[in-house]
């Protein structure tokens, strides 16, 4: 393993992205999310993703110099056209406008269209909670996941992220795929030659498997059976047809076998609790804290607690990167 400081991780990411002629706006936005993944010990969304970024670029499936375009479509609605660039750059452009609309209207939604997406959603919902807003974000991906009772992929991993601001300490945040696990976790098991648990995926014949490669060729499974399947369908609708963008099946067809990152849209919703509650805001937000205390007092963890603990460790001790991955990343500089 190679130990690196967070600054060193960021410097490496920036060098690689610049080497491949990404615009400076893309360089900074993408590097920040990759560092966030490593910092929070979320390796599936860390610097390993650079391999996919560059592969997607070489396949011609992402625009390195795309300039996102903002469309103000209603008092509580806006749209950012990523023009084929990475989602992070488009999100950054739209964020201040989403904040302004949510504070003005009490609730606002932002669609990010025609973007290439690989980022963890918790990075974005945390940006909204830092501004005191309640946040919800979701996006389809490629059709990798079979519906409950089926054997062929039709859904993406279709994550859902939620954030709730808290007066002291980190926000209440969860970000999970509606599949049993993020696809990146299976890919990391494949890289390490490790078996996956039963319930993560099936092979090409629809049979349960512990072989990571077989699951990647076959289909992933939803979490919770029909419940996860219904939520996956909801994500397809909210961040696909509702915002005029692709479903996961359409994204995979657009990919044309290049194995690039998913292409499509993302939906973000921001709610200002103080506009919703008015003069009684403090009273009701305090009741939320009572709920959280009741969870923790039982010895249970709040979602993302491990990430926040990892964040403190990484700031102090740095992070570790597998040597093989480090060599692959350095090769991208050649």
Curated annotation (Swiss-Prot):
Keyword Oxidoreductase on entry: yes
Key words, A-Z: NADP, Oxidoreductase
Any GO BP: 4-hydroxyproline catabolic process
EC top class, as a word: oxidoreductase
Lineage top rank: taxon: Bacteria
Catalysed reaction, written as an equation: L-pipecolate + NADP(+) = Delta(1)-piperideine-2-carboxylate + NADPH + H(+); L-proline + NADP(+) = 1-pyrroline-2-carboxylate + NADPH + H(+); cis-4-hydroxy-L-proline + NADP(+) = Delta(1)-pyrroline-(4S)-hydroxy-2-carboxylate + NADPH + 2 H(+)
EC number(s) from the headed UniProt entry: 1.5.1.21, 1.5.1.-
pH dependence of this protein's activity: Optimum pH is 7.0 for Pyr2C reduction and 10.0 for L-proline oxidation.
List of residues binding NADP(+): 117-121, 175-177, 226-227, 301-307
Residues at which substrate binds: 49, 157, 183-184
Induction: Expression is induced when the bacterium is grown on trans-4-hydroxy-L-proline (t4LHyp) and cis-4-hydroxy-D-proline (c4DHyp) as sole carbon source.
Gene3D superfamilies for this protein: 1.10.1530.10, Hypothetical oxidoreductase yiak, domain 2 (3.30.1370.60)
SUPFAM superfamilies attached to this UniProt entry: L-sulfolactate dehydrogenase-like
Active site residues per record: 44 (charge relay system), 45 (proton donor), 185 (charge relay system)
InterPro entries (alphabetical): Mal/L-sulf/L-lact_DH-like_ah, Mal/L-sulf/L-lact_DH-like_NADP, Mal/L-sulfo/L-lacto_DH-like_sf, Malate/L-lactate_DH-like
Keyword Oxidoreductase in annotation: yes
A GO molecular function held by the record: protein homodimerization activity
Role description: Catalyzes the reduction of both Delta(1)-pyrroline-2-carboxylate (Pyr2C) and Delta(1)-piperideine-2-carboxylate (Pip2C) to L-proline and L-pipecolate, respectively, using NADPH as the electron donor. Cannot use NADH instead of NADPH. Is likely involved in a degradation pathway that converts trans-3-hydroxy-L-proline (t3LHyp) to L-proline, which would allow P.aeruginosa to grow on t3LHyp as a sole carbon source. Can also catalyze the reverse oxidation reactions, albeit at a much lower rate.
Self-association and partners: Homodimer.
Membership in a protein family: Belongs to the LDH2/MDH2 oxidoreductase family.
Protein name in UniProt: Delta(1)-pyrroline-2-carboxylate/Delta(1)-piperideine-2-carboxylate reductase
The species this protein was found in: Pseudomonas aeruginosa (strain ATCC 15692 / DSM 22644 / CIP 104116 / JCM 14847 / LMG 12228 / 1C / PRS 101 / PAO1)
Gene from which this protein is expressed: lhpD
